[in-house]
Amino acid sequence: MDIKAYAKINISLDVIGKRDDGYHLLKMIMQNIDLYDIVQVEKIPNGIKLKCNKPYVPTDERNLAYKAAKLFKETYNIKSGIYINIEKNIPVSAGLAGGSTDAAAVLKIMNKMFNINVTQSELMNLGLKLGADVPYCICGGTALCEGIGEKVTKLKPFRDKILVVVKPPFGVSTKEVYKAFDLSKVIFHPKTNELISNIEKNNIEFISNNMKNLLENVTLGRYKIISTIKEEINICGALGSMMSGSGPTVFGFFDDMLKAQKCYEKMKEKYVDVFITRTI
């Protein structure tokens, strides 16, 4: 049994507080894009085995998809073993939820495969034990995510918007970025409610001009190349560009496929991980 595990971008990311346990309270708009891993799950006699086409991806308990299989087996007392194969296309440590979306895919497949058939809401609660992005990845589409990311409210779909996605040649630790984030230094917060109403109006110009990610305050300061990529995408004719999640990936929206194609070709001369895709 296999499914596509889609990457996500943030249309906005606001930090509104901090819990006693150190987790930040967020208000963010998440959006799936047509860039995906293919996650295959099969029954085997015992244990958990994981294989991936990218050698740098861990295939043991460090892998979130492996952890997802283990959690599901333990929660629902599954005796059968599990074989997971991941065809990885989403860059890792990129701010695109590559690990979370694979974990979500494993939970969704196992729920069907073993006829457990828990509700999406229950599956999302289980996914939260693996990471804050996993509940959204189970739900998908266009959504407002609050709390630490676990409170997911579906929004009107914001589909078929063209974007170019560029990841610089390094990864970023989400944990480290949040650790360095200082809420007291924030002056302007994202206009989340206005962004939501303009998603409903399908207003790509407003979205592109007003999308905001507070984690840029940390990551852009550490890596000048991210600002450079944003500028390069804008020069190519993007309606606007922004870093996704904790970074370092940058995306830009385009209203014209020809401009996007030219931008893709230009970026591909300098960077390895470049994609031309759409919102879904």
Swiss-Prot record:
UniProt-annotated binding residues for ATP: P91, V92, S93, A94, G95, L96, A97, G98, G99, S100, T101
Gene3D superfamilies to which the protein is assigned, alphabetical: 3.30.230.10, GHMP kinase, C-terminal domain (3.30.70.890)
Pfam family, any one: GHMP_kinases_C
NCBIfam families: ispE
Keywords: ATP-binding, Isoprene biosynthesis, Kinase, Nucleotide-binding, Transferase
Pathway in which this enzyme or protein is active: Isoprenoid biosynthesis; isopentenyl diphosphate biosynthesis via DXP pathway; isopentenyl diphosphate from 1-deoxy-D-xylulose 5-phosphate: step 3/6
The keyword Nucleotide-binding is assigned to this record: yes
UniProt keyword Phosphoprotein, yes or no: no
EC code: 2.7.1.148
An MF annotation (GO) of this entry: 4-(cytidine 5'-diphospho)-2-C-methyl-D-erythritol kinase activity
Function (record text): Catalyzes the phosphorylation of the position 2 hydroxy group of 4-diphosphocytidyl-2C-methyl-D-erythritol.
Protein's recorded name: 4-diphosphocytidyl-2-C-methyl-D-erythritol kinase
Superkingdom of this protein's organism: Bacteria
A Gene Ontology biological process term: terpenoid biosynthetic process
Family matches, as InterPro entries: GHMP_kinase_C_dom (IPR013750), GHMP_kinase_C_sf (IPR036554), GHMP_kinase_N_dom (IPR006204), IspE (IPR004424), Ribosomal_Su5_D2-typ_SF (IPR020568), Ribsml_uS5_D2-typ_fold_subgr (IPR014721)
Classification lineage: Bacteria, Bacillati, Bacillota, Clostridia, Eubacteriales
Annotated active site: K8, D133
Family to which the UniProt record says this protein belongs: Belongs to the GHMP kinase family. IspE subfamily.
Reactions catalysed: 4-CDP-2-C-methyl-D-erythritol + ATP = 4-CDP-2-C-methyl-D-erythritol 2-phosphate + ADP + H(+)
Enzyme category, top tier: transferase
